[in-house]
Amino acid sequence: IDEILQRIINFEPKQSKKIKIESVLKDQDIFELIEPSTDINDIIMPENTKELLENILKQQDKKVLERLHSWGIKSNKNIEAKIIFYGPAGTGKTMSALAMAKSMKKSVLSFDCSKILSKWVGESEQNVRKIFDTYKNIVQTCKQSPILLLNEADQFLSTRVDGSSGSDKMHNQMQNIFLEQIERFSGVIIATTNFLESLDSAFSRRFDYKIEFKKPDFKDRLKIWEKFLPKKALFEKDF
């Protein structure tokens, strides 16, 4: 009896072995896994843009979400956000997405949306589903939810075309599937695009945040030069 009691007292439940995300990703060629190292304070951007990003992070803070859930305001306590970063190329959209991931202590699964199109009938639409199905499978297998980063998502987000050609129908069908997947998505998704002007209104309604990234002004350009030029480099006078 003493032995049985001792076993009960000292019983430790077996820890379920956590599957590493790297091992799951070995069997697929869709996503690039990124472990972010950039801090949001390392990025030179307009102050109002930084404030917007910091506000999103505060709203998505785990303690805040748990409190809202306990009050019955939020149905679950998971971090969920659908975000669009838009603006000219080279303005820090991807880098800011990685910085936000670091602040949320999340890995990033990055996908280059320019690879989605296929010359084969129906394959582009299947590829859209495959992105989200694979992401969902990774989340369920690894018991963690990395941020899904869709780079250059212009063809997903642009206004649907009113045409009867095969390519027009394929484009619209692909976007309809994307809309459906966005509607169901659970987690954090960030899509980057250079062209917000052509954004379909249906997509605009389904994203929680739309953040503009502008070209740096003179003050920010000066900060960039000062950050990356060697401190002890010899320059001509008044450089």
Predicted regions: what is each one?
Residues I43-D238:
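Walker A/P-loop NTP-binding motif of AAA+ ATPase domains
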Residues I1-V64, I79-E80:
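AAA+ P-loop ATPase mechanoenzymes
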